[in-house]
């Protein structure tokens, strides 16, 4: 319907009128025939009649169109207010009429008092409600009902409390009924929602069960493989493998190669006693080569003779030389073992056993073993477990590493699932609410991962982003480096962010096992706890007996207790000499000598404490833990004066007595109860006493640490500066020859072949021999974090012990245990030994290993644990934190020897050619040199040559690495130009006949001298030699037999 004509100011154009309502057009619509009508008039007409109102043609509503120019003209007309009849004299444009009507003072409004039905102007509403309305509240009834009285009731005095209460009750009941209906609606809606969620939960549960069954099947398969591997790798008598026979093969070189690789050999030429079991074995045979034929060689054959020359006790180099010098036809005599019969009985649980402990083989050990070179002793042939019974192998022998490598690839293969997440921000400055982690150096690029999620953020409310997810794309752009990721995440161009995330497909937590298995594990845990309790009681009895024996006059020989070091294996030493050829360098022999004498009591104390939480009874308690604290030597005390040590010991004893006085009467009674007449105390009393002592000593150790820290703080500040300078001066050593660089190596370090510029190979393709395999470090996820926790426990060691604490040392926390004098030196390990035996304290097996390592995966989600690269980033942070915590106390404990521990190292994340990531150690020296270069460059950036000439301190110009490279290139070009000019001059002299024999002799001598000097320089310098080391050690050769010419002169200004 249109607008009334009398509302407009002045006359209205007839073209603005509607032919149906004869009013001014409101939202005009035009028909295909050209007629214009109001929208409210023409739409009902066309719907009913399906034709134009003028009856000219048939039309439909879809053919009607808006006339915007006509509408704009009408909106500019002046019109009176809608409330003109109520007194409003305002005249506005039609387009502003709606805005005026909202705030017009003459708009009709109903009184808000209950019962009043008057309609007033908006401006008169407040005055009416306060003053003139008969239904306004004026007070409370004083007759007893307590309801509000209106002005009308007070004026007429006709208020009835009973009727008012009934009316009020009815209103409340009506409200209750309304709320009840709403409650039923909400309950029905909630029931439907609950059913839907239960259905989804059931589907997820079924999927979880299917996944758990699939995982169990894989676990069973891997367990079978592990059992067979354990059985194959365990030492067995030679008679089980079958009889050996001597075979002679005749070989001819094809294209200069014999077509096979060898490993092994006696470790040293001087070792001619014949006791070593080393020999030369065939490790690989090239397909269609000279050795790959009927009557040729086979893998694992032991080479005895080559053309009559005995190689049974030869070294690896002697065997290579013998094959090189052999003339065709080459007669090779080998020892070959007959194939083993396949076991028919049931296979037991495969375990690796050393002298003192029994440890389960895990996947980390298998991966480490697969990367070791082939053993030099005849390895038992692996059985092919997954083949059908009727299928026989093509050869009698095969390489175990082939199976291990395939298994490693299958384990390392990760099936990823991708998810696209859209995050919507209401404001462009809102934070997404998650933190990313990535590499901080510039050597290699790596992925971007989600490390933390804010609980109340946009990402947390979305719920699809998880910790450990890798970000592949942001807003459709693939991420190449961290700069791009930061730029896209912080960009303010787009309020919405679209992320493409990748995570491992298997995302099961540890709760996938069924209830029966959990019950079984709980029972097993209780059994182990009972076993631990029983051992603790025996331990306490032996302690009481020992104390009584000491009081009766008997003495305990400390040397007897210490003699057990060489009788028990520490769990990390080598079991045979099969890996001796991994790196044939002189430092290995030194490491062997040191390793045999470095099995300390500290490792056993750490093991005893780590078993305390779990209750495992793998290792019995030993009397080694009861060595008196008085046995501490000068090396453990460091530079503490004797009077200070004695005063600290008295203070500690006083602390023990004061702490124990509150709980058990007298100090002597609570701390020294083994020496009294309480030998017959019951088990419950002993347990309570032990618990009280443990709690007291834990609080004492914290106070002791604070006392030591306050006592040493002033000295530490001065020593830190000296130690840092000493470390920088003497810490740069050759990593190829230094034994100190391996001082802190751990048992989960494995060897991986990488590309090297200095690989050595024999003439007949011995490239796979152990000597040409450089070493690199790879950390397993299980051991790295646990090792960091042990480092933190060792770092908190106190520097002194007390009398009462040495009596109960095995039952204390790691801080007291670390106070033993035998913890002063870390154990030296050989890199070639690592991985041959698992560490006892690292491997518990099964789910019971989790309680003893609370920091292992504390804040890492389950699905992120399957992401190898993300886990290694987290491990890097954990290891760096543990090392930083350990550095302070280690310098306090042994400040003299801290500078001799070798070059400082840091953990770096590296990327292999196949894309996998690993963590390795790199010297901090590179980083320090880079920082030093930047600092010097900043200091000398604003200095000119004239300024340097005027100043007293001659700084000199600093040349960057790129500039030094350019200098080297220019120097090379100048040298080549000089040689060219010299050669041209010599040619010219030859043509003129001026050259003489004397000059030729001089040139030959000079060239020979230069060549000899180059060789000497190579012997003096290496890749890691610095000018400071050259000046410190002089210009002597490494063996100290020669003195070379000075190659360098340094003038200090």
From Swiss-Prot:
Region of interest called Disordered, as start-end residue ranges on this chain: 563-604, 747-855
The membrane spanning regions, by residue number, are none
SMART domains, from UniProt?
A: PDZ, RING, Ubox
Pathway in which the depicted protein is active: Protein modification; protein ubiquitination
User: What biological process terms from GO does the record include?
Assistant: neuromuscular junction development; protein ubiquitination
The superkingdom of the source organism is Eukaryota
* Complex formation: Interacts (via PDZ domain 1) with kidins220b (via PDZ-binding motif).
List the protein's name. E3 ubiquitin-protein ligase PDZRN3-B
Q: From what organism does this protein derive?
A: Danio rerio (Zebrafish)
Lineage per the UniProt record: Eukaryota, Metazoa, Chordata, Craniata, Vertebrata
């Amino acid at each position: 319907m249109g607008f009334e004509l009398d509302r407009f100011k002045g006359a209205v154009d007839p073209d603005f009128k509607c032919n149906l309502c004869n009013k001014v057009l409101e939202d005009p619509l035009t028909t295909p025939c050209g007629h214009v009508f109001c929208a409210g008039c023409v739409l009902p007409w066309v719907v009913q009649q399906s034709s134009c109102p003028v009856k000219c043609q048939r039309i439909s509503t879809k053919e009607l169109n808006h006339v915007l120019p006509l509408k704009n003209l009408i909106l500019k007309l002046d019109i009176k207010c809608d409330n003109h009849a109520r007194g409003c004299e305002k005249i506005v444009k039609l387009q502003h009429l709606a805005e005026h009507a909202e705030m017009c003072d003459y708009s009709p409004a109903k009184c808000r008092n209950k019962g009043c039905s008057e309609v007033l102007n908006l401006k008169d509403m407040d005055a009416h409600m306060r003053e003139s309305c008969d239904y306004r509240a004026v007070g409370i009834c004083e007759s007893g009902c307590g309801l509000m009285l209106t002005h009308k009731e007070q004026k007429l005095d006709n208020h009835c409390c009973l009727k008012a209460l009934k009316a009020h009750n009815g209103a409340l009941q009506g409200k209750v009924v309304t709320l009840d209906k709403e409650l039923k609606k909400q309950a029905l809606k909630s029931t439907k929602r609950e059913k839907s969620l239960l259905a989804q939960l059931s589907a997820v549960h079924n999927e979880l069960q299917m996944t758990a069954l699939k995982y169990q099947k894989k676990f069973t398969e891997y367990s079978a493989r592990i059992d067979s591997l354990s059985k194959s790798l365990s030492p067995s008598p030679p008679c089980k493998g079958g009889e050996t026979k001597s075979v002679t093969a005749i070989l001819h070189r094809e294209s200069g190669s014999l077509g096979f690789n060898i490993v092994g050999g006696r470790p040293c030429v001087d070792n001619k006693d014949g006791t070593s079991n080393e020999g030369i074995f065939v490790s690989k045979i090239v397909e269609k080569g000279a050795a790959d034929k009927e009557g040729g060689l086979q893998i694992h054959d032991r080479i005895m003779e080559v053309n009559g020359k005995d190689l049974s006790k030869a070294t690896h180099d002697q065997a290579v030389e013998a094959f090189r010098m052999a003339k065709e036809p080459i007669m090779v005599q080998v020892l070959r073992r007959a194939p083993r019969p396949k076991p028919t009985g049931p296979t037991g649980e495969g375990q690796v056993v050393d002298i003192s402990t029994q440890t389960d083989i895990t996947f980390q050990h298998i991966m480490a073993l697969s990367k070791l070179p082939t053993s030099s002793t005849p390895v038992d042939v692996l059985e092919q477990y997954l083949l059908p019974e009727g299928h026989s192998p093509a050869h009698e022998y095969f390489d175990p590493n082939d199976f291990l490598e395939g298994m490693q690839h299958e384990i390392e293969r990760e099936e990823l699932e991708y998810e696209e997440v859209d995050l919507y921000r209401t404001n462009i400055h809102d934070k997404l609410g998650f933190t990313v982690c990535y590499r901080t150096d510039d050597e290699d690029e790596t992925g971007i991962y989600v490390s933390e999620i804010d609980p109340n953020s946009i990402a947390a409310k979305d719920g699809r982003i998880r910790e450990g997810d890798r970000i592949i794309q942001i807003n459709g752009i693939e991420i190449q480096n961290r700069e791009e990721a930061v730029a896209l995440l912080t960009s303010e161009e787009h309020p919405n962010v679209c992320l493409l995330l990748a995570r491992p497909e298997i995302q099961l937590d540890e709760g996938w096992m069924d209830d029966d298995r959990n019950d079984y594990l709980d029972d097993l845990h209780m059994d182990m706890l009972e076993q631990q309790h029983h051992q603790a009681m025996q331990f306490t009895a032996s302690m009481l007996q020992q104390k009584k024996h000491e009081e009766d006059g008997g003495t305990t020989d400390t040397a007897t207790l210490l003699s057990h070091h060489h009788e028990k294996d520490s769990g990390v030493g080598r079991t045979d000499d099969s890996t001796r050829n991994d790196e044939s360098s002189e430092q290995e022999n030194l490491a062997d000598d040191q390793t045999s004498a470095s099995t300390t009591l500290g490792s056993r104390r750490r093991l005893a404490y780590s078993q305390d939480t779990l209750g495992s009874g793998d290792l019995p308690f030993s009397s080694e833990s009861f060595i008196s604290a008085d046995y501490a030597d000068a090396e453990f005390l460091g530079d503490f004066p004797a009077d200070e040590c004695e005063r600290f010991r008295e203070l500690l004893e006083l602390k023990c007595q004061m702490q124990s006085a509150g709980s058990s009467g007298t100090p002597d009674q609570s701390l020294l109860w083994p020496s009294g007449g309480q030998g017959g105390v019951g088990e419950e009393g002993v347990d309570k006493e032990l618990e009280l002592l443990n709690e007291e000593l834990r609080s004492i150790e914290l106070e002791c640490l604070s006392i030591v820290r306050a006592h040493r703080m002033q000295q530490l500040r001065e020593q830190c500066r000296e130690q840092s300078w000493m470390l920088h001066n003497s810490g740069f050593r050759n990593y190829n020859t230094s034994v100190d660089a391996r001082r802190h190596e751990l048992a989960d370090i494995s060897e991986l072949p990488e590309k090297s510029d200095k690989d050595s190979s024999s003439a007949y393709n011995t490239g796979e021999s152990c000597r040409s395999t450089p070493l690199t470090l790879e950390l397993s996820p299980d051991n790295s974090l646990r090792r960091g926790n042990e480092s933190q426990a060792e770092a908190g060691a106190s520097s002194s012990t007390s009398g009462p604490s040495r009596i109960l040392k095995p039952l204390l926390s790691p801080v007291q245990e670390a106070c033993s004098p035998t913890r002063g030196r870390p154990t030296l390990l050989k890199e070639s030994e690592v991985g041959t035996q698992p560490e006892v304290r690292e491997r518990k097996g099964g789910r019971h290993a989790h309680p003893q390592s609370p920091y292992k995966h504390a804040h890492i989600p389950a699905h992120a644990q399957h992401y190898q690269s993300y886990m290694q980033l987290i491990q890097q942070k954990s290891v760096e934190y543990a090392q930083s915590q350990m550095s302070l106390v280690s310098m306090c404990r042994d400040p003299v020897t801290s500078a001799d521990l070798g070059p400082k190292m840091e953990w770096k994340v590296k990327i292999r050619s196949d894309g996998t990531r690993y963590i390795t150690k790199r010297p901090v020296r590179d980083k320090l040199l880079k920082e030093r270069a930047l600092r010097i460059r900043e200091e000398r950036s604003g200095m000119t040559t004239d300024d340097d000439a005027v100043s007293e301190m001659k700084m000199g110009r600093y040349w960057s690495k790129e500039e030094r490279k350019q200098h080297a290139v220019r120097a090379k070009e100048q040298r080549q130009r000089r040689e060219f000019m010299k050669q041209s001059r010599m040619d010219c002299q030859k043509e003129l006949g001026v050259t003489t024999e004397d000059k030729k002799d001089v040139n030959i001598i000079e060239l020979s001298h230069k060549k000899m000097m180059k060789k000497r320089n190579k012997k003096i310098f290496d890749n890691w030699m610095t000018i400071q080391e050259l000046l410190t050690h002089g210009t002597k050769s490494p063996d100290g037999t020669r003195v070379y010419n000075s190659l360098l002169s340094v003038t200090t200004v």
